[in-house]
Amino acid sequence: MGTVSSRRLWWPLPLLLLLLLLGPAGARAQEDDDGDYEELVLALRSEEDGLADALQHGATATFHRCAKEPWRLPGTYVVVLKEETHRSQPERTARRLQAQAARRGYLIKLLHVFHDLLPGFLVKMSRDLLELALKLPHVDYIEEDSSVFAQSIPWNLERITPARYRADEYQPPNGGSLVEVYLLDTSIQSGHREIEGRVMVTDFGSVPEEDGTRFHRQASKCDSHGTHLAGVVSGRDAGVAKGASLRSLRVLNCQGKGTVSSTLIGLEFIRKSQLVQPVGPLVVLLPLAGGYSRVLNAACQRLARAGVVLVAAAGNFRDDACLYSPASAPEVITVGATNAQDQPVTLGTLGTNFGRCVDLFAPGEDIIGASSDCSTCFVSRSGTSQAAAHVAGIAAVMLSAEPELTLAELRQRLIHFSAKDVINEAWFPEDQRVLTPNLVAALPPSTHGAGWQLFCRTVWSAHSGPTRMATAMARCAPDEELLSCSSFSSSGKRRGERIEAQGGRRVCLAHNAFGGKGVYAIARCCLLPQANCSIHTAPPAGASMGTRAHCHQQGHVLTGCSAHWEVEELGTHKPPVLRPGGQPSQCMGHSGASTHATCCHAPGLECKVKEHGLPAPQEQVTVACEEGWTLTGCSALPGTSHILGAYAVDDTCVVRSQDVSTTGSTSEEAVAAVAICCRSRHLAQASQELQ
């Protein structure tokens, strides 16, 4: 250990922070699309570790670490190679690192080599060697290991059952028997009568040592968290999917603590099992949370692309879920916790996480489930782990009915069948209320006939930041169509939004304005089979003319309007006018704005326009689509300069304006919400034929 101290270079903290901010790694973080919060992690990079010098002198790879210092595990690192590297390269790179370290008098312990999940390896080494490792060929980035934690601090079964189907006994549409659920948790008491014969405890185990030399490993303590969650998923009496089979992987120790690296190895174990013996629908339950981790999110993305459904706890820190992993991974279904009154769960001074990275909430307080104290004992537990277990069970029920559902289709159905607008949003911080979904998970009333529905969801971007040229970007899942794009700014200063192609996919971009506090981009993402969509743009016109963007191709219908403008005064004093025609085929905008029409062709697709305006400025104006129609586009028709933006909440278009009492405005001009509502006759007909 003395060698480590003698070789370390100490930098003055202000100079070190300046080097970090100016370094190329910071620029790379802004460009990376694996997670919007990566720059937060990079900003906290190695303040006192002497790593800034390494990142400035020839290192093409980047270094990442947990933003929460107490959770960091210095000395253990995940080295991730570039995607195009050969399968043999991880071992070769590890051996090269070991050889070069040995020449410098250091020993490196190779703990694990990743092949099937991502190319890379796990090593234990001195942090003095990070400069050397970052300069190795083929290395993409290195992440310091960090801790993850269990997230647990029969009203619940009644709550997830649709109201008109409730009876004295919980009766889901099916038992989820076609689905296999992997649980990454503590060990499990497989002999408990709730789960006996339903759980297979695998031989996998990768856990850190418990803290403290006097910790006594009682079986009941070591098994408690995993046993309870296994019972919530598939227990005979208290389970959601009573027929689902469950496989247990131990990644948390007896204190409910694990590491990012252990979780990665567990996920790779699942991927290997899937490759060796492909099974039907597969759900992975991740009832744990740690600080934001690029490598853990990347692993979840790889597994999701292989057809695995991942369900994760949002976290119990009463904080933005986007700051934690795996909750922040876009490919993961992230679940917050509510109580019996459908309100957010409070756990002492903490509580459920929230924000745009949460997909929905589920029962997570005083949940009765199997106890590891004895084979017939039950116990009540609370937390987002319990909430995630409910959604994993609901997913098993849905997948048993429709085994071919993709992740995007399953997520859309979970959102569609949830109870809506039942959570008191005042519990959340004010700036998070508009971003947090007001959805509580529920079983579908029937597992048949849902295919006729045109499913859409709203995806919010991360906040752009306050600089004049700042942009925000929202994107849909690969299987979804981006049917419209809108923007929102709490200050009202923005330069509109547009849809742009990036990397073969369309994304929604929103633009901040001078003096603004930042902007959000809001994408409307839909499942539209056999769709052919395109964007038609009308550039700024003459001073006395408006702009019109048309859907001129035969059979194409308008699904959304957007506009952006470069002149600051236009955004401040003359916002663009977006009004689809009587037949939704064109978008009309202000003469100084570029107006964009999203036009789509799909079998049986039909759309119409709904508009609702008020004669004087209001803080909020809404218009909703009728039952059977789905909102695809939402925009504002303003006659005032105080529009904050427009966004979709379920099938309702919401237009927000600044509080007139605070702006001093005396304008009497109307504000209108304009909705484009669509449906697919083709999907409805196909569903009826199947029935």
From Swiss-Prot:
Disulphide bridges, residue numbers: 222-254, 322-357, 456-526, 476-525, 485-508, 533-600, 551-599, 561-587, 607-678, 625-677, 634-653
Single annotated GO MF: low-density lipoprotein particle receptor binding
Assigned keywords, A-Z: Apoptosis, Autocatalytic cleavage, Calcium, Cholesterol metabolism, Cytoplasm, Disulfide bond, Endoplasmic reticulum, Endosome, Glycoprotein, Golgi apparatus, Hydrolase, Lipid metabolism, Lysosome, Phosphoprotein, Protease, Secreted, Serine protease, Signal, Steroid metabolism, Sterol metabolism, Sulfation, Zymogen
Region C-terminal domain, annotated ranges: 449-691
Glycosylated residues, chain numbering: 532
Domain Inhibitor I9: 76-148
Keyword Calcium in annotation: yes
Cofactor: Ca(2+)
Cellular component aspect of the GO annotation: cell surface; COPII-coated ER to Golgi transport vesicle; cytoplasm; early endosome; endoplasmic reticulum; extracellular space; Golgi apparatus; late endosome
Keyword Glycosyltransferase in annotation: no
UniProt xrefs under CDD domains: PCSK9_C-CRD (cd16839), Peptidases_S8_PCSK9_ProteinaseK_like (cd04077)
Annotated ranges, domain Peptidase S8: 154-460
Pfam family, one: PCSK9_C3
Propeptide residue intervals: 30-151
Family: Belongs to the peptidase S8 family.
Protein name in the entry: Proprotein convertase subtilisin/kexin type 9
Organism: Saimiri boliviensis boliviensis
